UniProtKB/Swiss-Prot annotation:
This is Disrupted in renal carcinoma protein 1. Residues 1-23 are annotated as: Disordered. It comes from Homo sapiens. It comes from the Eukaryota. The keyword DNA damage does not apply. Residues 10-19 have a biased composition (Polar residues). It is linked to A chromosomal aberration involving DIRC1 is associated with familial clear cell renal carcinoma. Translocation t(2;3)(q33;q21). Expressed at low steady-state level in adult placenta, testis, ovary, prostate, fetal kidney, spleen and skeletal muscle. Keywords: Chromosomal rearrangement.
């Protein structure tokens, strides 16, 4: 029996349309990544990233980003807070798509 992550999956999300910023539901059937539509690959990667983060202990999802929110009280200065945010920017690119999926 094939493992669950090897089977095609179906995701439904909303993508912006040209109709005054409205969103139209779109279903993506995800074949193996080599044949998938680029948008579906991006959504699947975001979903896989979130699944991996959910299985980790809730302290660190990478060597620079913390899974728990960092407050100003935990850092010595505003510039240090901004530095942490900048370091996390690249690894959190997929979260925007993930958040859009969870809202639909």
């Amino acid at each position: 029996m094939p493992e669950a992550h090897m089977q095609p999956a179906k995701l439904q999300t909303s993508l912006p349309t040209t109709d005054h910023g409205s969103k139209k539901p779109v279903s993506c059937y995800l074949p193996p990544l080599s044949n998938a539509h680029p948008m579906c690959i991006e959504v699947q990667n975001a979903q896989n990233c979130s699944s991996a983060a959910a299985t980790l202990e809730p302290s660190i999802i990478s060597d620079t980003c913390f899974y728990k929110p960092i407050t100003k009280d935990q850092l010595s200065s505003r510039s240090e807070l901004n530095t942490v945010r900048l370091k996390c920017l690249n690894s959190l690119r997929g979260w925007k798509i993930l958040n859009q999926l969870s809202l639909t």
